Amino acid sequence: MSLPKPNSFRAGPDERGHFGTFGGRFVAETLMPLILDLEKAYAAAKADPSFQKEMNGYLKDYVGRPSPLYFAERLTEHLGGAKIYLKREELNHTGSHKVNNVLGQIMVARRMGKKRIIAETGAGQHGVATATLCARFGLECIVYMGAVDVARQEPNVIRMEMLGAKVVPVQSGTRTLKDAMNDALRDWVTNVATTFYCIGTVAGPHPYPAMVRDFQSVIGHETREQMMAAEGRLPDSLVACIGGGSNAMGLFHPFLDEPAVEIFGVEAAGHGLTNLHAASLAGGRPGVLHGNRTYLLMNEDGQIQDAHSISAGLDYPGIGPEHAWLHETGRVTYLSATDEEALAAFQLLSRLEGIIPALESAHAIAKLSQLAPKRPRDHLMVVNLSGRGDKDVPQVGDILRGRKS
């Protein structure tokens, strides 16, 4: 009797944090002891049944999980073809998938005795989730946010401050997510002993990409159970937007070893792939940023290029290393949607289903017009609705009013 083949798509990373040639731990010597401590603390937490039991309790009673899997009937009729389900992460407490990961990291931070929590944020959803959990557990919270994002995501800035967080506008570089992460890393190096850095996506040095993925995988595990209950079988395809890629990895990972399930990630094409965009797989090449090797937007000299997206949460010049590996292996197909396509999808879902999506999630919705009509009516397609669009209503309103005037 032959042994089963190893689980090739879900076994990573290796002990040094690599997914193929991607990932790793590229950090200052000052941080290495803390990174190793974090790796040990996370491994101990995973092995402790009481940790998972406590986390499951908070996911149920505080976050509001499981999030529904909703059949989008009118959207399905409008597009024709595939039967579209929405995994409704926007109904979580704080309004997005971000809280799944933050809860897990804050629980690890408490096990490590850390009282000061720092975070970076783009759209503000990770910042709001971090501020929320810090308020719940009585921890100091500092959130770094690019000054451009502070201006375009004002509702979330106000929420963070109401929750007791200190929001630090970052004025360097392009004043967006990349620069917020740079300043958060500088803070961490300076305050290693007291501070826990709560990274919001599947990027950064090992063990962050794997840890964030694990905490977000509740999305995919629930989707499997819910689809079996609703349809008696697994979905035929999955679709999710990608900045760093945590909502996508959370949905994708539990399905990676199901070869019959097609998987699509949608990057932000901005003004188009030849101009300002944030599609690092479509328009970038491998390099090192923020502690890991992945695909990055770089110029000929290897300098990081400016990213652009209408969505603050996708406005990042890189992608999580596991996504880079899945791209190179061909297991996941990566597409891209422009600002205009996302804006149209934002309005379409609002009018057809009465659900206002985050601009990030609207990038995934935008690709349905390309994917759904080509598939038969019994094809089951799940789209991760990663966040709600309340935060984007002022920005979208300004854009639409400007076009009417």
Curated annotation (Swiss-Prot):
Q: Name one GO cellular component term.
A: cytoplasm
Enumerate the cofactors the protein uses: pyridoxal 5'-phosphate
- Catalytic reactions on record: (1S,2R)-1-C-(indol-3-yl)glycerol 3-phosphate + L-serine = D-glyceraldehyde 3-phosphate + L-tryptophan + H2O
Kindly report, in one word, the top-level EC class recorded for this enzyme: lyase
Q: Which UniProt keywords apply?
A: Amino-acid biosynthesis, Aromatic amino acid biosynthesis, Lyase, Pyridoxal phosphate, Tryptophan biosynthesis
Q: Does the keyword Ribonucleoprotein apply?
A: no
Q: In which pathway does it act?
A: Amino-acid biosynthesis; L-tryptophan biosynthesis; L-tryptophan from chorismate: step 5/5
Question: Which residues, renumbered to this chain, carry the PTM N6-(pyridoxal phosphate)lysine?
Answer: 98
Molecular function, one GO term = tryptophan synthase activity
Q: What is its EC number?
A: 4.2.1.20
Q: PROSITE patterns from the entry?
A: TRP_SYNTHASE_BETA
Q: How does it assemble?
A: Tetramer of two alpha and two beta chains.
Family, according to the entry, reads as follows:
Belongs to the TrpB family.
According to its UniProt entry, the function of this protein is described as: The beta subunit is responsible for the synthesis of L-tryptophan from indole and L-serine.
Q: Write the protein's name.
A: Tryptophan synthase beta chain
What organism is listed for this UniProt entry? Afipia carboxidovorans (strain ATCC 49405 / DSM 1227 / KCTC 32145 / OM5)
